[in-house]
């Protein structure tokens, strides 16, 4: 069975909702925690799902700090923003967030949702 964790930084609750929806699709008991409560080490997890909101064209400050601490071979990144999720700008935001991950981390997927 896959051992995963979902971590998120949320201001309005939208990313938290998405995080819990992701966790609901994973094996029962998969942790879903705020970045304030995330572990220091992710090596015991097969996969890490990391969520944040986009603030001024980049991951929010707490999200940035969390991404810098995440190192894993299988990381899926998800975000919300006030823009077209299919735009070049959204791609740039995700790319800049992925670049914050610890060196050697493997990104297995990304997702961005528009929020109002």
Identify the role of each PLM range.
Residues 2-25:
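N-terminal beta1-alpha1 ligand-phosphate binding loop
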Residues 38-44:
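Short amphipathic alpha-helix with an adjacent loop that forms part of the alpha/beta core around
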Residues 11-12, 38, 55, 83:
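Short beta->alpha junction loops/turns
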Residues 1-2, 38:
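Detector for methionine-enriched segments
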Residues 4, 25-33, 44-51, 55-116:
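FMN-binding flavodoxin-like domain, especially the glycine-rich phosphate-binding loop
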């Amino acid at each position: 069975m896959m051992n995963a964790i979902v971590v998120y930084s949320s201001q309005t609750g939208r990313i938290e909702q998405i995080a819990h929806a992701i966790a609901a699709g994973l094996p029962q008991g998969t942790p879903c925690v705020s970045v304030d409560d995330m572990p220091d080490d992710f090596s015991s997890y097969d996969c890490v799902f990391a969520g944040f909101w986009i603030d001024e064209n980049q991951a929010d400050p707490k999200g940035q700090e969390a991404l810098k601490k995440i190192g894993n071979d299988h990381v899926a990144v998800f975000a919300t923003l006030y823009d077209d999720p299919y735009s070049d700008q959204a791609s740039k935001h995700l790319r800049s967030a992925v670049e914050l991950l610890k060196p050697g981390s493997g990104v297995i997927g990304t997702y961005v949702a528009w929020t109002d």
